[in-house]
């Protein structure tokens, strides 16, 4: 029998090529939030997808370094802080605390976070390298821009001839040129060779990647809406400095839709993640995102949410009933999670959620059959596999088999064995209400 050697296969969302990750050190950068308000559900989809990616890579014995930026200086931050009559730092502190709290609620594994303002003092040096190599210029108004005309490869991510984009700036040589350092009188400012100001958004991420990985980034990810111009511009700066792409592979996450429209703050059709989690268990949100491949749009609807609620309840019931039968049968211990190859292989194949979920439902069906037949050996195998599969998807269930609940299960078992069926049925009803049967 051939030994299973787990390797992750990725379909690059820029090249559309399938690649196997052969190296064991995987460096990941995921574009993070601009912390001026709470995240909506669409913002959480990349977080959850990349959390599963990290879990799968670690299970496959890859060494993972996962970095995400937190943009804590921005025109929107300045505007909101002024409206609330607090400093930018106060607003960002509140929002960063809320963001990290949300990550815990979503059961996201630890990520190394880099706040932009902690590294701004080093960014002028990065920009100076671009100026020195002739890829940047200072405008008559004192702003420093990247000159896209100096880079023939510009537009490679968009995979098309890039035309103009809307921009209020009038001091650029080309409308596609993007700001590296802008002079400003608003908000917090930093000194640089080009005067007091702050860096542009695109250079912040490009610098943090350079600071963290130099030219050794394996996977760069974010929402598909960041592909152009944000990722295009990041890549342009890196190409200018290193004459090679910013990252080996790209992963772009599809839009979250609501009634066939992209969920966004600008359209005012969004639902805040924190509000969703006051109503629903975090597993329901994660399960929703597993219903479509990560690069496809997902159209959210009330019926889809209701179905996800039903699915999670069915899976949780299978787990709890299975655990109850181990207590009922006086087993010494509930089996520990054990790697389940069909789900593992599905997720190693570019996070094939559909295939993974198919195998999860097969396990649930087998568990229900084992319970009906009181097949303990089958229960042991199938529960250990189901627990592993749920954990790697970040939706494992904590045991509700407390000391009191165990005593109640044992009482039910004793009454049944002694033929006290009426009393046993009363206890059984209590177990059902508790979700133990």
Swiss-Prot record:
Motif placement: 'HIGH' region: 33-43
GO biological process: cysteinyl-tRNA aminoacylation
GO molecular function: ATP binding; cysteine-tRNA ligase activity; zinc ion binding
CC terms in the record's Gene Ontology section: cytosol
Residues that hold ATP according to the record: 265
Disulfide bridge partners, by residue number: none
UniProt-listed Enzyme Commission number(s): 6.1.1.16
Catalyzed reactions per annotation: tRNA(Cys) + L-cysteine + ATP = L-cysteinyl-tRNA(Cys) + AMP + diphosphate
CDD domains: CysRS_core (cd00672)
Location of this chain's protein in the cell: Cytoplasm
Textual note on the cofactor: Binds 1 zinc ion per subunit.
Short sequence motif 'KMSKS' region: positions: 262-266
Keyword check for Iron: no
Complexes and interactors: Monomer.
Protein name: Cysteine--tRNA ligase
Species whose genome carries this gene: Mycoplasma pneumoniae (strain ATCC 29342 / M129 / Subtype 1)
Classification of source organism: Bacteria, Bacillati, Mycoplasmatota, Mycoplasmoidales, Mycoplasmoidaceae
């Amino acid at each position: 029998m051939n030994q299973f050697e787990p390797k992750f296969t990725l379909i690059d969302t820029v090249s559309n090529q399938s690649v196997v990750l052969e190296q064991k050190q995987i460096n990941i950068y995921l574009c993070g939030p601009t912390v001026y308000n709470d995240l909506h559900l669409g913002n959480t989809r990349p977080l959850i997808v990349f959390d599963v990616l990290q879990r799968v890579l670690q299970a496959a014995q890859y060494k993972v370094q996962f970095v995400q930026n937190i943009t804590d200086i921005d025109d929107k931050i300045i505007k909101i802080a002024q409206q609330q009559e607090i400093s930018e730092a106060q607003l960002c502190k509140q929002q960063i605390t809320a963001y990290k709290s949300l990550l815990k609620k979503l059961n996201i594994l630890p990520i190394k976070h880099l706040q932009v303002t902690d590294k701004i003092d080093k960014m002028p040096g990065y920009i100076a390298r671009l100026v020195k190599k002739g890829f940047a210029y200072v405008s008559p108004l004192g702003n420093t821009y990247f000159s896209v005309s100096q880079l023939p490869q510009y537009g490679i991510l968009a995979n098309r001839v890039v035309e103009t984009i809307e921009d209020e700036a009038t001091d650029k040589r080309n409308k596609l040129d993007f700001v590296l350092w802008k002079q400003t009188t608003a908000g917090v400012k930093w000194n640089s060779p080009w005067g007091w100001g702050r860096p542009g958004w695109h250079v912040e991420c490009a610098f943090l990647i350079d600071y963290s990985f130099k030219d050794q980034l394996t996977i760069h990810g974010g929402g598909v809406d960041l592909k152009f111009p944000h990722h295009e511009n990041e890549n342009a700066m890196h190409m200018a400095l290193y004459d090679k792409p910013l990252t080996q592979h790209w992963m772009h996450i599809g839009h979250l839709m609501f009634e066939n429209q992209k969920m966004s703050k600008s359209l005012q059709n969004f639902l805040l993640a924190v509000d969703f989690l006051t109503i629903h268990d975090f597993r329901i949100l994660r399960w929703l995102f597993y219903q479509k491949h990560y690069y496809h749009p997902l159209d959210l609807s009330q019926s889809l949410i209701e179905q996800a609620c039903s699915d999670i309840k069915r899976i949780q019931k299978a787990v709890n009933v299975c655990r109850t039968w181990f207590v009922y049968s006086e087993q010494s211990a509930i089996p520990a999670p054990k790697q389940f190859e069909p789900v593992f292989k599905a997720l190693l194949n570019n996070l094939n959620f559909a295939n993974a979920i198919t195998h999860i439902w097969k396990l649930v069906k087998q568990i229900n059959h084992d319970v009906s037949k009181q097949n303990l050996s089958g229960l042991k195998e199938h529960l250990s596999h189901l627990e592993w599969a749920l954990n790697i998807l970040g939706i494992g269930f904590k045991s509700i088999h407390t000391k009191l609940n165990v005593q109640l299960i044992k009482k039910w078992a004793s009454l049944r064995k002694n033929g006290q069926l009426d009393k046993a049925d009363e206890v059984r009803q209590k177990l059902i209400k508790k979700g133990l049967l």
